[in-house]
Amino acid sequence: MKATENRKVNEINEILLPLSKNLKNVEGFVIVSKDSLVKVGNIDGEDLEIISRHMAVVMGSSEMLYKRFNDEVEYIEIKGKKHKIILYNLDDFIFAVVGNIKADEIKDKVMELKFKVNNIDGLTAENIIEEIAL
């Protein structure tokens, strides 16, 4: 089981490391299930739980709206005066990036996560962040 967890951590690190190195304006990330259970993230404290709950609500509402048009949500961009939050739809999971970035710049890399996150139950934020400096 430990070898499987390590492999999953390495696969996700391979995707996240280039994102963190190339994008200086990324302040944090979180991967949550659609029912708002945090899987991996580097946002501290209460903010992580609050953000994950809101992410699930926003994504769920958007998916319901898009189904009415026979379409699917790829990502949602929420822009404030100082920050941006981009929510990427990874089927059963949501990947959120907080910072001052353009959604299209990292979309392809983030979408690679869609094939990797479905079995990340053993991952922790500490495992991921060990090799990532966001």
From Swiss-Prot:
One Pfam family recorded for the sequence: Robl_LC7
SMART domains noted in UniProt: Robl_LC7
Protein name in UniProt: Uncharacterized protein MJ1389
Source organism of the structure: Methanocaldococcus jannaschii (strain ATCC 43067 / DSM 2661 / JAL-1 / JCM 10045 / NBRC 100440)
Lineage, broadest ranks: Archaea, Methanobacteriati, Methanobacteriota, Methanomada group, Methanococci
